Amino acid sequence: MSFSVDVLANIAIELQRGIGHQDRFQRLITTLRQVLECDASALLRYDSRQFIPLAIDGLAKDVLGRRFALEGHPRLEAIARAGDVVRFPADSELPDPYDGLIPGQESLKVHACVGLPLFAGQNLIGALTLDGMQPDQFDVFSDEELRLIAALAAGALSNALLIEQLESQNMLPGDAAPFEALKETQMIGLSPGMTQLKKEIEIVAASDLNVLISGETGTGKELVAKAIHEASPRAVNPLVYLNCAALPESVAESELFGHVKGAFTGAISNRSGKFEMADNGTLFLDEIGELSLTLQAKLLRVLQYGDIQRVGDDRSLRVDVRVLAATNRDLREEVLAGRFRADLFHRLSVFPLLVPPLRERGDDVILLAGYFCEQCRLRLGLSRVVLSAGARNLLQHYSFPGNVRELEHAIHRAVVLSRATRSGDEVILEAQHFAFPEVTLPPPEAAAVPIVKQNLREATEEFQRKTIRQALAQNHHNWAASARMLETDVANLHRLAKRLGLKD
């Protein structure tokens, strides 16, 4: 089998039609899966010795949340080391990273696997993986044909990475690799709320504004602070963390501003505080709402004038620190109640960010579950940790009052329970491995009994209309691709569509 010019042109056209990088990547993967007739396809970005899924088709949704470290996935490591097409034989002893992750085939292992490393110049930027359940599924395609596919994918990915760098104004030093991927954070999610949050982080990171990060306990406020710091010009300097809720009043001032020798009993030497440690960098004050009013006043002075005084010292020290603060309280209500200074609130909330709770993030719960499953797999030395359909359904319908932190603990606990009832190094998490209270799953929809109101000819034509509409929708109204999917000649498809009233 060989690719026609039309096939390659169709792939290129789909890349151009996409609105935004994510849409283009998904169109590419979906089109490739149809053209190559594979069971699963994935586009991965390479970053810091791990592959990060950007778009998938035919794989469980939680794959998008997984981070595939090369050390734990020998096939992906082989692809990363190769400079060309990699074909894994059906009897390869190297485990496939997608075993158990093809919906409906969880108990079966992938038999055919092809990996295409993607390069920008000499730099590895990603990979394209093709998987099938039949041992010889990709034998009909030559290496040269697969190289053409890889070239198209590499071009799309390298352009996206370059645009991403330019848009973020986070250009790398001149001696760095021009297509080096941006730093990966653990802020996993594609929901509208998380997409908006990531955009806001990108905007505020380039500035030097103080940021107030609000959100319920367990939503990931510390990860937001880390993402802001790492995308900011201060990233080369330290990010210093301080949990205000864990500060006893007696040592809080010393922790923040430091002290000199002899300032109080036990002060046997000079000691720098968190502000000094964060000089030219960023200070993250977690649970800022727990600070006493006295300390709030001293913190306000630092934000206003940029100088600090160590406990027991009359001299002032200049510091250049960006402050990121986080709270799970409503600080406006705290101000009204007299428990938080209004002037400090306004100083901190120059650019407020709200981290959405997990219950408002839709399918993000499945992506995050995949991330934690992969973490458990690596930590416990397991060959695979996958979610059953029942487990995914349960996770999507639980409210998670403890948010992402509760999900993480639930996955770890479920893995331990599963291993206790099943031998071997393969773990399939079932719904019964999760102990969530008061989870009401929607009842399965009863199959409707059709009422026949048409004669055979009318019913046949209605079925044909529906089938053609679905094919066109799946192929973005590309008639040639739709004809291939329906295994008919494109001219015949046009004639049939005209007869059925689907086109003029």
Curated annotation (Swiss-Prot):
What SUPFAM superfamilies does UniProt report for this protein, alphabetically?
GAF domain-like (SSF55781), Homeodomain-like (SSF46689), P-loop containing nucleoside triphosphate hydrolases (SSF52540)
- Kindly list any coiled-coil regions of this protein: none
Q: Which SMART domains match?
A: AAA, GAF
* CDD domains tied to this protein: AAA
What ranges are recorded for DNA binding?
A: 479-498
Alphabetical GO biological process terms: phosphorelay signal transduction system
What the entry lists under PROSITE patterns is as follows: SIGMA54_INTERACT_1 (PS00675), SIGMA54_INTERACT_2 (PS00676), SIGMA54_INTERACT_3 (PS00688), SIGMA54_INTERACT_4 (PS50045)
Pfam families reported for this sequence:
GAF, Sigma54_activat
Q: Which domain of life is it from?
A: Bacteria
Ranges of residues in domain Sigma-54 factor interaction: 187-416
Q: Which UniProt keywords apply?
A: ATP-binding, DNA-binding, Nucleotide-binding, Phosphoprotein, Transcription, Transcription regulation
Where does this protein act, in terms of pathway?
Answer: Nitrogen metabolism; nitric oxide reduction
Key word DNA-binding present in the record? Answer: yes
Amino acids binding ATP: 215-222, 278-287
Modification type 4-aspartylphosphate: residues? 57
Annotated GO molecular function terms are:
ATP binding; ATP hydrolysis activity; DNA binding; DNA-binding transcription factor activity
What InterPro entries does the annotation carry? AAA+_ATPase, GAF, GAF-like_dom_sf, Homeodomain-like_sf, NorR, P-loop_NTPase, Sigma_54_int, Sigma_54_int_dom_ATP-bd_1
Q: What does this protein do?
A: Required for the expression of anaerobic nitric oxide (NO) reductase, acts as a transcriptional activator for at least the norVW operon. Activation also requires sigma-54.
Output the HAMAP family linked to this UniProt entry.
NorR
Q: This chain belongs to which protein, by name?
A: Anaerobic nitric oxide reductase transcription regulator NorR
Q: Which organism is it from?
A: Escherichia fergusonii (strain ATCC 35469 / DSM 13698 / CCUG 18766 / IAM 14443 / JCM 21226 / LMG 7866 / NBRC 102419 / NCTC 12128 / CDC 0568-73)
- This chain is encoded by the gene named norR
